[in-house]
Amino acid sequence: MKKLMVIFMCLVMCVSFVGCNNTEKQNDEAKETLQRVLEKEQTFTAKTIVFSDKTTEQTLEKYHFQTIDNAYYSFVPEQYAFVDMDNDNIDELVILDVKITYYLVLHYENEKVYGYNIGARSLIDLRTDGSFMTSSAGGISSIGNMCFDGSECKVINKALANDYDQEYFIDGKKTDQKTSKKYFDDWNENTSKISWVTIK
């Protein structure tokens, strides 16, 4: 019986080791590809009009987009950070245009790079674990991570506070203001802000 247990434990350790090595290899491949985009050597797929279904091949050097109110932005990459935005152990590349306070999140999937432009209030206080805060003019704040599917990305809220309507949620379940505030305070104190690297 002991011998069987030892064999079983060895098999579990081997599978875990292979799994870790495979994820590390995928992360290295993703970062190498994203680095080529950063160095303007490779294109990425992105929407040039927010809320449109159409995508085009872009280069970081000439990346531009149009918002829902038809404002036109020519994106100027100034700072970047590698961070796992969707908790799959594979890093995304987040690039910041300081002047217009817009972010470009680059995600590697199935040998392609996809880009998503994110406004300032939709990506506040990005943390090393990929979590971030969002805020709206209506007194609604949330903490969440991103989820990617090809050219689409969405925010998965871990916590949401609607002070205007006095509604509070943690992991999709309703809670009270005190518990919600503690969650936001704990997140603020116990997670680390990312360190941006200046693009030279």
Residue ranges and their predicted role:
Residues 87-96, 128-134:
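Acidic/hydrophobic-patterned starts of short beta strands in beta-sheet-rich repeat architectures
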Residues 109-130, 154-167:
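A short, surface-exposed interaction/processing loop segment used at functional sites
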Residues 16-19:
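C-terminal motif of bacterial Sec signal peptides marking the signal peptidase cleavage site
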Residues 26-75, 112-122:
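Blade-edge motifs of beta-propeller repeat domains
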Residues 1-8:
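Positively charged n-region of N-terminal signal peptides that target proteins for export
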Residues 22-49, 133-200:
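Acidic, small-residue rich beta-repeat scaffolds with periodic aromatic anchors
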Residues 102-116, 146-148:
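Beta-propeller blade repeat segments, especially FG-GAP/WD-type strand-to-loop junctions
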Residues 76-85, 122-131:
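Beta-propeller blade termini
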